[in-house]
Amino acid sequence: MFHDVIKKRHAEKASKAGVDGLILVAAGAGGHGGTINPMPFISEVRSFFKKTILLSGCISSGRDIASAIQMGADLAYMGTRFINTKESMAEEEYKDMIINSKASDIIYTASVSGVAANFLKPSLEAMGITEETWSKKGKIDFGKE
């Protein structure tokens, strides 16, 4: 069993529970990603965890995979990179949004669900979520319906 973690304390708890591997969700990962730079994160976790470590977050090329392995990860974990494949069933509009977005379009906010996550600015805007809203902590008022 592999368990995803965003902090060292989560990795320690998962390790004590006997997991087979850890997926380190570092800064830049899509969705509910972590905020820790992958270099110190891998080093910290590798100091006590000797089983399989996967690194996720901002990995989209062979060079990124090689870097993850050089830093001490056993494997790399990619998700967003595969959304734009022909095999993906994602809508073309969504695929285009990913291709046309820049690093500056990544917004880390807890305003959507109360739990911090990375979103692409165009997707927030498409849902009617403004910068004023995503800058606030808490939940968005979706109304009474």
What are these regions (language model features)?
Residues 28, 57-58:
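Short loop or secondary-structure boundary microenvironments that flank
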